[in-house]
Amino acid sequence: MQTYAVYWNDPEGERCAGRVSLGPSFAELNGGTSQGQLRSLRLGFEEIASVRYQHGRLHLWRRNAAPLRLGSADRPGALRELAERLKSQLAAAVA
C-alpha cells in the first residue's frame, strides 16, 4: 500500500501530521498532534464527494462531514500524485 507524508486539521481543528494510505475502497489518515495524541480517520470512497488539488493543498469534500485539506510533508509532487491516484480510484469505485 502506497503511503504519503501529510499534515491536516482534525475535526476539532487541531493540526495533525502523519501519513495517508490508499486502500482498495478507502483512504486512511494516521498520525498525531503536537501534544502526542494519536489520530486516525478512515474515509470510505463512498464518503468522498470530490477531490481537488489547488494551491499546494489537497481538498477532500465529504458527503456528510466538513471538508479536509491536506498538505504535503513528502517529496515534491507527491500531493499532486496522491490527488490523481485518489481521483482514479474513486472513479473506478463508482463504475
Residue ranges of predicted features:
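Acidic, Ser/Thr- and proline-rich intrinsically disordered linker/docking segments
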Residues: 1-17, 22, 28-30, 36-95
